[in-house]
């Protein structure tokens, strides 16, 4: 320690001496820089700088984290537009049988239509090939027209028609029916008579008729001679069996 202090004192004296001598002589030109001194001690920490600009995004991202817990349900949204109708589904199974209905009131046969007629030939008019039965015996609800020989249906349903006609000759008759706008239908009956005796030709049928349909008896022009007298009568009858549903 004492050696260092002595060395420092010697240096100070030498510098002073040189300075004094230098004042007495002419100034010499500047010399070259000396050797760099020993680095000084670190200074005190400076003040905190301002915040820098955000850096560019990194090239690689981190590992994807685990799925988080489900959040709370949001409020209901507004109703959407009505969609197009879907395709028709398959036919469902039959449902159980319903309960038995209440028994209805008893029907009154007096309130039901009961068309029926019977007519015989007495003094019939000539009406082509139509066989006219001019004398009416029964004509319930007036379905039979004795001037034309036609039955006109007013109550749709199933009817029975029959005839018994007297003749001494060969005879062919038909029960003819006709619907409005439809071709007529006929059902023929024939009988031969070689002895010239009274003989009955009979026929009958059941027909389903609609309102406005007509039924009559028609003769064959070549075999249509009917007995006309007081000894026997020819008759044409018909009636409703039951109405259509």
UniProtKB/Swiss-Prot annotation:
GO terms for cellular component: collagen trimer; complement component C1q complex; extracellular region; extrinsic component of postsynaptic membrane; extrinsic component of presynaptic membrane; glutamatergic synapse; postsynapse; synapse. It is found in: Secreted; Cell surface. Residues 1-22 form the signal peptide. InterPro entries: C1q_dom, Collagen, Collagen/C1q_domain, Tumour_necrosis_fac-like_dom. Ca(2+) binds at residue 199. Gene3D superfamilies: 2.60.120.40. The keyword ATP-binding does not apply. The modification 5-hydroxylysine is found at residues 48, 67, 100. Residues 31-109 form the Collagen-like domain. Keywords: Calcium, Collagen, Complement pathway, Disulfide bond, Glycoprotein, Hydroxylation, Immunity, Innate immunity, Metal-binding, Repeat, Secreted, Signal. Pfam families: C1q, Collagen. The C1q domain is the ligand-recognition domain, which specifically recognizes and binds the Fc regions of IgG or IgM immunoglobulins. The collagen-like domain interacts with C1R and C1S proenzymes. PANTHER family: COMPLEMENT C1Q SUBCOMPONENT SUBUNIT A, EMILIN ELASTIN MICROFIBRIL INTERFACE-LOCATED PROTEIN ELASTIN MICROFIBRIL INTERFACER. This is Complement C1q subcomponent subunit A. It comes from Rattus norvegicus. The lineage of its organism: Eukaryota, Metazoa, Chordata, Craniata, Vertebrata. The gene is C1qa.
């Amino acid at each position: 320690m004492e050696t260092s202090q002595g060395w420092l004192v010697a240096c100070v004296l030498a510098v002073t001496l040189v300075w004094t001598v230098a004042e007495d002589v002419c100034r010499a030109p500047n010399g070259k820089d000396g050797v760099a001194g020993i680095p000084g001690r670190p200074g005190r920490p400076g003040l905190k700088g301002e915040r820098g600009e955000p850096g560019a995004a990194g090239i690689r991202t981190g590992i994807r984290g685990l799925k988080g817990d489900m959040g709370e349900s949001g409020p209901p949204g507004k109703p959407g537009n009505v969609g197009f109708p879907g395709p028709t589904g398959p036919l469902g199974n039959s449902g159980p049988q319903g309960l038995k209905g209440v028994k209805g009131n008893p029907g009154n046969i007096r309130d039901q239509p009961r068309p029926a007629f019977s007519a015989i030939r007495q003094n019939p008019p000539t009406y082509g090939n139509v066989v006219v039965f001019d004398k009416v015996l029964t004509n319930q609800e007036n379905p039979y027209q004795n001037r034309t020989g036609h039955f006109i249906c007013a109550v749709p349903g199933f009817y029975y028609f029959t005839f018994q006609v007297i003749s001494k000759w060969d005879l062919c008759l038909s029960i003819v029916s006709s619907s409005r706008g439809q071709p007529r239908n006929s059902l023929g009956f024939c009988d031969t008579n070689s002895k010239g005796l009274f003989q009955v030709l009979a026929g009958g049928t059941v027909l389903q008729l609609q309102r406005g349909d007509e039924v009559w008896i028609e003769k064959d022009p070549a075999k249509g001679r009917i007995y006309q007298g007081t000894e026997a009568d020819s008759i044409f009858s018909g009636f409703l069996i039951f109405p259509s549903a």
